[in-house]
Regions:
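A short beta-strand micro-motif common to beta-rich folds, especially ectodomain repeats
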Residues: 14, 54, 64-77, 163, ...
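Interdomain boundary/hinge segments at the C-termini of tandem beta-sandwich modules
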Residues: 82-89, 189-195
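Short strand-coil-strand connectors
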Residues: 37, 74-78, 115, 124, ...
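Surface-exposed, short loops/turns at beta-strand junctions within beta-sandwich domains
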Residues: 60-66, 157-159, 168-175
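Solvent-exposed, low-complexity, repeat-rich "mucin-like" stalks and linkers
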Residues: 1-33, 90-125, 196-226
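Surface-exposed binding patches on compact interaction domains or structured appendages
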Residues: 24-55, 93-94, 116-164, 222-227
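Short beta-strand segments
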Residues: 78-82, 92, 108, 185-187, ...
Length: 227
């Protein structure tokens, strides 16, 4: 997974002070209450009396765009707001690191989770003669490479996606290797070697008594011998 910020929970203490008398000592005169907090914030206490420290905890956040809010501390008819902000991050967490196809050809899915606004994908030139890319699928909706994801779900959370790649049958006796590029990152694709093929024509020869030369045609995808 690639992320540009840490995703651990963070707690910040908010100090709440009482009034101060003429010699500088705190005077515990007023009760306080914390109100109007964002739903994603947890407070260790929402009310108390006098000088206090309250832990303000933000949970793991997987959105791409930051979020903000505030909490309000009230003492009698006095109010003070504390601004709260949590940074977003770019998340790219793929469950597929490579794709391996059988010799007869098949379709396989490249899957993962991300919060990007769009995803680019393509078959590289070293595999373009035998591999094709389908559509990007997010929540049953299909998208072309680079198209914006409807509703931008990644702004506030990760979403799952899949891209289907289809390999044609391998007509050679060699393993085929190439690459796909998804979100600017290269991933390896391979295909098992195909079966050897052989066709000979004609399959019988008849020669004149005086002798003559005739030809047979050999069609194959690998080395051959005659015995």
């Amino acid at each position: 997974m690639v992320s540009n910020s840490s995703l651990d929970e963070r707690a910040t203490a908010v100090e709440i002070g009482g009034l101060v008398d003429g010699v500088g000592a705190p005077v515990m005169r007023a009760a306080y209450a914390l109100r109007s907090k964002p739903s994603w914030i947890t407070l260790s206490s929402v009310e108390g009396t006098g000088n206090s420290r309250v832990d303000v905890t933000a949970p793991v956040y997987k959105g791409r765009e930051g979020r903000s809010g505030s909490i309000t501390v009230s003492v009698e008819d006095l109010k003070e707001d504390v601004a709260i902000q949590q940074s977003g991050s770019n998340i790219w967490d793929v469950t597929t690191q490579s794709l391996a196809f059988v010799k007869t050809g098949e379709a396989k899915k490249f899957t993962g989770n991300t919060n990007l606004a769009s995803i680019t994908f393509a078959v590289d030139s070293d595999a373009s003669n035998w591999l094709t890319a389908g559509k990007l699928v997010v929540a049953t909706k299909q998208y072309n490479s680079g198209a914006a994801i409807e509703g931008d779900p990644g702004a506030s959370d990760v979403y799952s996606f899949e891209i289907t790649f289809t390999a044609a049958a391998n007509p050679t006796v060699s393993i085929r290797t190439g690459h796909i590029t998804v979100n600017g990152q290269k991933y390896t694709v391979t295909q098992a070697a195909g079966d050897a093929t052989l066709s000979v024509s004609p399959t019988s020869l008849t020669f004149a008594a005086a002798g003559e030369t005739k030809q047979i045609s050999i069609t194959t995808n690998t080395a051959w011998t005659i015995s």
